[in-house]
Amino acid sequence: MIPGEIIVNKALGEIELNQGYDKYTLSVANIGDRPIQVGSHYHFYEVNEFLSFDREPTLGFRLDIPAGMAVRFEPGQSRTVELVAYSGKRIIQGFDGKVMGKIKE
């Protein structure tokens, strides 16, 4: 098994992950001098300060990639990423400690 792999009955057809959740697409640049890697469930609002982007709209969002995967930003690299909203109780704890509680709607 591959991390993030989903094995389903082929008779079900194609399954879209995170269907119906709010999504947000943005451009992100690594302005630092070292690579930065962001995991699938890391609160994007709280990622490394050397990733340059408008943070406010990313509050309550994570990368829209399979569980266990990550996106790597090389120094000087810009790339477009898609984010997906956290679901459930929408309580953010830990990470960089910038939120520590329920995300306001």
UniProtKB/Swiss-Prot annotation:
Its main location: cytoplasm. Keywords: Cytoplasm, Hydrolase. Pathway: Nitrogen metabolism; urea degradation; CO(2) and NH(3) from urea (urease route): step 1/1. GO terms for molecular function: urease activity. It is found in: Cytoplasm. GO terms for cellular component: urease complex. Its EC number is 3.5.1.5. This is Urease subunit beta. It comes from Shewanella halifaxensis (strain HAW-EB4). The gene is ureB.
